Amino acid sequence: MTPDISTKKVVHVIFQSREPKRSGEVHAFIDGLNDDEKAHLVAIAWVGRGAFEAEDYAEALSTAFTEATTPTADYLMGMPHLAENLEAGLEALDIDVTEAEEGFYDN
């Protein structure tokens, strides 16, 4: 199973979450995602931090949906090393982010 969120959106969260002064922007961006995208973002972060293996992505996604009790933006912004977890999750899932990273600041 592959994540049903655009790589560009995940890269947006990665880049913005590295800038402490932009935490409000990241929070608003995550809040603006639909519920499916939010669950996929959480599942990618969980794979990245080692809570789930890449081959267990479907289980991570299901868990993200069923255990969502805190607003997703609050949960993710409170996660230590969010950017690194998302990067590691994308890498574990064999998702190439080169194009999304190159175009990030072109917008």
State where each predicted segment sits.
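Helix-rich interaction surfaces within compact, conserved domain-sized segments
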Residues: 67-107
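Surface-exposed polar/charged interaction patches
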Residues: 16-20, 36, 67, 96
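Short, surface-exposed beta-strand/strand-loop-strand elements in extracellular ectodomains
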Residues: 52-63
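Short, hydrophobic/amphipathic alpha-helical patches that form generic packing surfaces
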Residues: 39-49
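Short terminal alpha-helical segments
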Residues: 2-24
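Structural motif
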Residues: 3, 28-39, 80-81
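Residue-level detector of well-ordered alpha-helical segments, enriched
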Residues: 9, 37-41, 56, 85
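Noncatalytic partner-interaction/assembly domains of nucleic-acid and motor enzyme complexes
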Residues: 22-31, 51, 71-77
